[in-house]
Design a protein with these regions (language model features):
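Glycine-rich, mobile lid/loop segments that gate access to catalytic sites or pores
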Residues: 1-96
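Glycine-rich anion/phosphate-binding loop at the beta-strand->alpha-helix junction
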Residues: 5, 73-190
């Protein structure tokens, strides 16, 4: 920890100097959904000051109640984390083997509890038409932006300048006190 702290602070300072902001909130936990990002920059700033990273504090209280209930029963809960990166320059990534989604997914799936990763609309895009999913480009105060951000800030494996939106499904911790079935390897029997 002591060795990684200076590196984390240096990275944070470097990102801030490039006007890149990163923030994560608990989108879903213990059956309760938090609000989605709306005023991204303001919400990113406020999330960094919170002990329990949610946008809607009332939803956070409900999550905590459900977490405590599961813990009292010797169980655990999973959830979904939503991360947003703003200020990422256009052109980060590669279209083929080092796509931005591929590189980020590789890192995220290296966390053992992460069981699913999606960008932008993710799995919801399976129910959309191409005309709905496509992020149309437009000029806004002289800048090229997209009207929607269904692709989560990435087109063809490369950042497009819109906020990068990533969701991770995190499984409930398997280290629980609730009795469960297992196998006795020595005697070769179920226990």
């Amino acid at each position: 920890f002591l060795l990684s702290l200076p590196l984390a602070l240096a990275k944070s300072s470097m990102l801030a100097s490039k006007n890149i902001k990163i923030g994560t909130h608990i989108l879903k936990c213990a059956g309760v959904f938090d609000d989605s990002f709306k005023n991204i920059d303001d919400e990113l700033d406020s999330l960094n000051d919170k002990a329990f990273a949610v946008i809607n504090d009332d939803k956070g209280k409900q999550m905590i109640e459900n977490i405590e209930k599961a813990a009292a029963e010797g169980d655990s809960v999973g959830g979904i984390l939503e991360t947003v990166v703003t200020g990422l320059p256009v052109g980060v990534g590669e279209p083929w083997f080092d796509s931005l989604e591929g590189v980020l997914s590789h890192g995220l799936f290296s966390i053992p509890a992460v069981k699913g990763v999606e960008f932008g609309q993710g799995f919801n895009c399976a129910d959309m038409l191409g005309s709905e999913m496509n992020d149309s480009f437009k000029l806004d105060n002289g800048e090229i932006v997209t009207e929607t951000n269904n692709n989560g800030g990435i087109n063809g494996g490369i950042s497009n300048g819109m906020p990068l939106v990533i969701k991770c499904a995190v499984k409930p911790t398997p280290s629980i006190s609730k009795e469960q079935n297992t196998v006795d390897f020595i005697n070769k029997e179920n226990t």
